[in-house]
Structures are given as structure tokens and as C-alpha cells.
Design a protein with these regions (language model features):
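Hinge/cleft segment of the Venus flytrap/periplasmic-binding protein
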Residues: 14, 19, 284-366
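An alpha-beta-alpha
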Residues: 23, 27-29, 42, 130-186, ...
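Structural recognition of the beta-strand scaffold that forms the well-ordered cores
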Residues: 23-26, 35, 54-56, 79-83, ...
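Short beta-strand elements in bilobed, periplasmic/extracellular small-molecule ligand-binding domains
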Residues: 47-58, 157, 180-203
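Hydrophobic alpha-helical
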Residues: 80, 85-99, 175, 198-262, ...
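Flexible loop/hinge segments that line or gate small-molecule binding clefts
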Residues: 95-139, 260-261
Length: 366
């Protein structure tokens, strides 16, 4: 299984081998586009491995994020996976889990060691913080911004969700990198990108931000909706349609819409990154193995699993994605049970390989 028997397992409250394992999930929303996909994938894993899952929705509000860990600890969880907002929230989360002897892993997030050195140092030495599953967000941002630039868009407005969110900051770095590279090479054809306006995690706020940009920027020809779970994008796309500007304002985003195929056809969307809802599954597997006593935390460190994005910019792309990621899960019941016995290097390899082609090769009838 995962390495040798851990030292920290000796200080667990009770043995988990004879009872059902309980894993808590601290998530911004378990009902929006990305959150509901994440929950379905986790529920499938819980069912396959007889794990009880407890969800707390915290809306990416800092006080609610830290409170969610206390709530899940009080519920008797053996492990917790968390999609926090700011790195600073992880100090409280890590300390709570250490005190309660509960294993903790992040999903869709990792601690920025440059921006948050104290939190990073705490995470490395904390016996119950075991790691993070996340994406290469700078490359994600860079790829999406270049989709717009290559379409000829030069006045790009930026919609974030929460100021200071670690993932948004990384995506923003990527957007800025694409813009600065283009501008350095095209002095007479520069791209202007706005400062971000923040839409939280609701469709109403997404619509309000899009309307604000359309009213204040007469040259606006593109909108980046950085994320927020999918609902802000629904609102923004709806506002652009109501203004009669569908196809005139090009939109890219992260977190796939349920009707992405239609939006690509009508011009409501230009391109999107997503398909990464298996990310929390890998955090689940890390915590599950730790609770089973099959994990040893590295000395002065922790483990990270990097999950790639899938990029879609045509209906042909989306049709294949829909077949293998919407109509079914990227991992079936048999594969989920097998993953529970995989080593960490094996899980890292599986995560790095996930793509439409990967799922197609595993699930197509031979």
C-alpha cells in the first residue's frame, strides 16, 4: 500500500480498521456546477469503498471556512479534505486537525510557499497535514488568455470571485503573463486587460460584474471569468446575451458549464478549461489511505498531486468530453476500488495522465 506504517498513526484516537471511515468535505458549494460534479465523484468513491462522507458548504468566506473544520472535527471525521480560499485559513485548519488527530488534505488548492512562507512551514511540519491536489493554474490562465488574444481581442475585462483567493492569484499571473508577452512583441497592437472585479460565487453577482464592465468599457471585446464554481459564469453569459452581445464579447473561463456544447455553438463561450472534478477524488484517496494506516508523511514536507486541465474550444472537443466525463465518471467502480490500494507514485501517475483520450482508452469496449 502506501509506504510503511506511520508514526503518526500511533496517536490516532481509535483504530479505523474495524469501523467505517468517515471523511469530511469542506467545500465552497456542493450544489453549483463544479461543486456538484465534485460531490458526485466523491460519493461514487465513498460508495465503492464504504466510506461515510460529511459535507459542509462554506461559500469561500474565511470565517465559514475555518468553522467548517471545527464542525467536521466535532462530527468525528477520521480525515478531512478542504477547498479553502486564502492560504491564511490553513493555519487554523491545520492546527484544529493536529489537535484532533484528523488527517487533512487540500483539493483545488495548494499553499503558496512564496506568498505564505509561515503557513507553508507549518504545513511541512504538521503531523496530520498530508498534502494537496491542485492544477497548474498559471499555465491555465496563460492558455485561456492566449485563446482570446489569438482571436484578435484587445480589450479584455477580468472577473474574479474572491479577492486574495490563492487560486485566482495564480490564474491572474497566467493572464498577465500572456498579455505582457504579447505586448512586448506587438508594440503597436497592445492588449489592455482590466483590473479584476469580484463576483463571489453566485450567478447574480456574475451578471452584475458583466453589466458593470459592459457599461463602463465601450471597447470591451472579451471577458475572462476566472472561476468561482461555474455560477458566476452562468450569470455573466446571461447578462451578455441580454445585452445582445453574444459572440461580440468573447468569453473564456474555468469550470465547465453543463450546456457548454450549446454555448460554443452559439458563441456564448469561446473556450473553457475544466474537467478537473476528479481532483478531490485524489485528496480523498490520500486521506483514506492515511486513515487506514497506510501513509507516512515525508520528513519536513508533504505530498502534492498535480491534476491537468482539459481545454475545450469547439463543439467537437466538447462532444468527446461529454461522452467520457459527463455521461459517465472518468473512473468506474472497479477502478475506484483499485485506486484505494495504489501507492502514491501510482496515484500521481494516474492523475497526470487524465484526459479524454485516457478515459476513452480505459472505458471503450475492446
Amino acid at each position: 500500500l502506501w509506504h510503511l506504517q506511520p508514526v503518526v498513526a500511533q496517536v490516532q484516537k481509535t483504530s479505523t480498521s474495524a469501523k467505517q471511515i468517515k471523511i469530511g468535505v469542506s467545500i465552497w458549494s456542493s450544489t453549483d456546477v463544479l461543486g456538484s460534479q465534485s460531490k458526485k465523484m466523491l460519493d461514487a468513491a465513498g460508495k465503492a469503498l464504504n466510506v461515510k462522507l460529511v459535507y459542509v458548504d462554506q461559500g469561500h468566506e474565511s470565517a465559514a471556512v475555518t468553522d467548517s473544520i471545527s464542525t467536521l472535527a466535532a462530527a468525528g471525521c477520521d480525515g478531512i479534505i478542504i477547498c479553502n480560499s486564502a492560504d491564511s485559513e490553513m493555519t487554523s485548519a491545520i492546527n484544529t486537525c493536529n489537535s484532533a488527530h484528523i488527517y487533512l488534505a487540500q483539493f483545488y488548492r495548494t499553499i503558496n510557499k512564496v506568498a505564505s512562507p509561515q503557513v507553508y512551514s507549518l504545513a511541512k511540519t504538521a503531523p496530520y497535514y498530508i498534502g494537496a491536489v491542485h492544477e497548474d493554474e498559471v499555465t491555465n490562465g496563460y492558455t485561456l488568455a492566449n485563446m482570446l488574444i489569438k482571436k484578435g481581442d484587445r480589450h479584455i475585462d477580468l472577473e474574479g470571485w474572491v479577492a486574495g483567493d490563492a487560486t485566482f492569484i495564480s490564474r491572474w499571473q497566467g493572464y498577465k503573463k500572456a498579455v505582457s508577452e504579447w505586448n512586448a512583441a506587438h508594440a503597436s497592437d497592445k492588449v489592455i486587460m482590466s483590473a479584476p472585479q469580484y463576483a463571489g460565487t453566485t450567478a447574480e453577482q456574475g451578471a452584475a460584474v458583466a453589466n458593470s464592465f459592459m457599461n463602463s468599457d465601450s471597447k470591451m471585446d472579451a471577458l475572462i471569468v476566472a472561476g468561482g464554481g461555474g455560477d458566476p459564469l452562468v450569470g455573466s453569459v446571461g447578462a451578455i446575451k441580454s445585452a445582445g452581445k453574444t459572440g461580440k464579447i468573447h468569453v473564456v473561463s474555468t469550470d465547465f458549464l453543463p450546456d457548454l456544447g450549446k454555448q460554443l455553438t452559439t458563441g456564448g463561450m469561446t473556450g473553457e478549461s475544466g474537467g478537473h472534478y476528479a481532483d478531490p477524488l485524489y485528496a480523498f484517496m490520500m486521506v483514506y489511505n492515511a486513515a487506514k494506516g497506510n501513509y507516512k508523511k515525508p520528513a519536513n514536507g508533504y505530498d502534492e498531486i498535480v491534476n491537468p486541465y482539459i481545454y475545450v474550444s469547439s463543439t467537437k472537443d466538447y462532444d468527446k468530453y461529454a461522452k467520457y466525463f459527463v455521461s459517465e465518471f472518468p473512473y468506474n467502480d472497479k477502478e475506484l476500488k483499485a485506486m484505494a490500494n495504489d501507492t502514491l507514485p501510482e496515484l500521481k501517475k494516474q492523475a497526470a495522465a487524465i484526459s479524454v483520450k485516457d478515459v476513452e482508452s480505459r472505458h471503450s469496449v475492446k
